[in-house]
């Protein structure tokens, strides 16, 4: 069988980066090409600067210019519907030119366009679920717009020919809440490439910008939303500072909870003990991993845990919540990182104090983690994805015969 021509749909793709999804889709697309597994076209949204079409690292990227996304969730739903209409129109035109064998959509944000295009092309539809609205809101999806998003995700996963989940936790979660048949969801974890994590800054100068030589830096990274659990880390910090004294925090990210988190920091007397950096690019982030004394991932809900993986690959000791996909990235046994009871700020404080006070433990975790992260290889991710494509296309051929 010749390698398939695949159309990947994603609402974000570099240079537009909202979160981890853009990075995931880029690396997957590039590795599908690099491993000779597929010819890959990515259909995504663009801006006033990005070219409408270009070839990047062997990937054909097609962009549809869209207005800046609104921050208000009610307006966002209408914006997503408009984006899907535009992606659908562009996809129809691309299909006439390229004749795709398979459509691969990422998350609910491109579900409608993916469904219509797969129907038009008479080809299989694969979807990757990176997170669910049910999980993000701890099961509260009874009111609009959460109910709408949950409904789209339910329809999308049942309509797809196959669903990809990034962890065994997510496979079970998706199968349960959307009543999917056994075997309909396949686990293909996210990957990492340590070469991508090379810092761009002078690390000594960068560290001096945020901390004195005798101060310890605690790094938190991600979207500033409730489910990421940053409020737990802030709650834990006053006691840590009282015990150890010379501790500062850095929070890298932006989101709807930013104002609340800053207000919480002020209320806890932390304004002079850390910095909210806002959104930062990958180059700066990779440098922050190198200057931090530890990275904390305190999520209440986490399908996978890419931040933890990146931190470990960068040689930064890591503490994660004992929840979701983080359990697979940082297995039990304190071999590659520490885990704390999810939602428990007091236990988090204990683990942070322990790690900052034990250099032998820190060094051992860093050494073990550097080997552990090698098992999350993007080439393996691409090959597993290509095998799934082959299985789905084979099933489609048998059905059509």
Positions of the model-derived regions?
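N-terminal subdomain of nucleotide-sugar transferases
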Residues: 1-60, 397, 401
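A conserved mid-protein helix/loop that constitutes part of the nucleotide-sugar donor-binding site
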Residues: 23, 216-239, 249, 256-262, ...
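Carbohydrate-associated surface elements
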Residues: 46, 169, 191
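Nucleotide-sugar donor phosphate/pyrophosphate-binding loop at the beta->alpha transition
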Residues: 124, 134-155
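Short alpha-helical donor nucleotide-sugar binding micro-motif in glycosyltransferases
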Residues: 279-280, 287-292
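Aromatic "clamp/platform" in nucleotide-sugar-dependent glycosyltransferases that forms part
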Residues: 300
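Short hydrophobic beta-strand element within catalytic cores of glycosyltransferases
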Residues: 317-321
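Conserved acidic donor-binding segment of nucleotide-sugar-dependent glycosyltransferases
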Residues: 332-333, 337-345, 354-359
